[in-house]
Amino acid sequence: VKEEALTPALSRSRERGIRFAGYAAVFDRPDKGGDIVRKGAFARALERAGEVPLLWQHKAGAVIGRIEHLSEDERGLRVIAAVGDARASRLLVSGKVGGLSFGYRVREATAVGSQRELVELDLVEVSLVANPMQPRARVHAVEVAPS
């Protein structure tokens, strides 16, 4: 995990504390369960999404911050978020936790052998996790705001 400015515009955020950028999903790569998220799988969900919660380890009652930006790019589902939870912030900054994951409902999928191609998904939440199902779904930048 690198500590760096996320972008000049986003660095001017009024949020204090820890912010990160990373990928909650990576396209066209099988996860540990054999699911493959295809590019465009989140397009409709992002159009109709309200606020998507940022959770700790997929626990419904464990909101640890606020997602500031969600978008699909060529690589996957990009996330920029502010973390307000002190424990999660410490673990993120220390590099002890740096995985990302997402909760979802399948709208459209295709079975391909023992794998599933996820074509359209509803996005329920994004989580900071210790052990992501998609090993490439990681935080790639952390920003510590001055106090």
Residue ranges and their predicted role:
Residues 44, 50-59, 100-101:
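Short conserved beta-strand and strand-loop elements enriched in small hydrophobics
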Residues 11, 33, 56, 135-138:
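A generic alpha-helix propensity feature with a strong bias for hydrophobic helices
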Residues 30-39, 54-61, 84:
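Short low-complexity stretches enriched in small and charged residues
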Residues 1-10, 49-50, 57-71, 85:
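Short small/polar-residue motifs
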Residues 17-21, 29, 53, 66-147:
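Residue microenvironments linked to proteolytic maturation
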Residues 1-13, 17-48, 142-146:
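Polar/acidic, low-complexity leader/linker segments enriched in S/T/G and N/D
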